[in-house]
């Protein structure tokens, strides 16, 4: 991803939604809604001071909510762009106008708590379709103990646990007590073939 971010022919737009596409191969016009980050990508030096002083602690979605992070944060170390962002749903200023600690902590003056969404119109030559995936309903997983037994984790949660950059630095430990797992049952394709 970092190498992609350096390409002069590729523009990475995060926190965005594709609204419409018109045109033909080699000549498309795309309308994109870019949601606010509340931290200017061009000014942010990724020093982390905004997160260091942010008083709000939230579940870390990148680590499948197995850990916590500050509300002013970068999703992961190799994120592109490298700038931090603020989740408006959990921001004390956005919800109660009660805090601006991050603004005074940021020496680069990159924080803009008034940033608005932008509508972009892009002329592009090619489209890379990345449809993503849907999460399985927790109801399907309940019969296997998920949500009731703390050591039952999803495949994505297990992936974060085994990753060297994950919350346990690749050590497979039980969420219930932080001890090493001695036996593991790996159930695959749960809910995938359900109609």
Regions found by a protein language model. Name each.
Residues 150-163:
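Central beta-strand plus flanking loop segment that forms part of the substrate or channel wall
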Residues 134-135, 158-159, 192:
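Active-site/binding-pocket entry motifs
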Residues 1, 13-43, 55-129, 133-153:
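Non-heme iron-sulfur electron-transfer modules
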Residues 3-11:
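A structural motif corresponding to the C-terminal end of an alpha-helix
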Residues 45, 170-195:
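Rossmann-like NAD(P)H-binding beta-loop-alpha module
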Residues 5-6, 121-123, 176-181:
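Flexible, charged surface loops at secondary-structure boundaries
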């Amino acid at each position: 991803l970092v190498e992609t971010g350096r390409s002069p022919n590729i523009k990475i737009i995060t926190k965005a939604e594709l609204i419409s596409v018109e045109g033909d191969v080699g000549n498309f016009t795309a309308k994109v809604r870019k949601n606010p980050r509340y931290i200017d990508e061009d000014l942010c030096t990724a020093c982390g001071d905004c997160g260091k002083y942010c008083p709000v602690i939230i579940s870390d979605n990148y680590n499948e909510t197995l850990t916590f992070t500050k509300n002013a944060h970068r999703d992961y170390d190799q994120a592109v762009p490298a700038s931090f962002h603020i989740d408006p749903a959990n921001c004390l200023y956005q919800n109660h106008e009660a805090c601006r600690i991050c603004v005074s902590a940021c020496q680069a003056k990159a924080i803009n708590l008034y940033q608005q969404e932008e509508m972009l119109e892009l002329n592009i030559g090619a489209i890379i379709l990345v449809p993503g995936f849907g999460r399985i309903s927790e109801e399907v997983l309940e019969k296997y103990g998920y949500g009731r037994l703390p050591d039952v984790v999803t495949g994505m949660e297990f992936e974060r646990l085994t990753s060297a950059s994950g919350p346990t630095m690749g050590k497979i430990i039980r969420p219930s007590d932080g001890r090493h797992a001695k036996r593991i049952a790996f159930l695959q394709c749960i809910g995938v073939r359900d109609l």
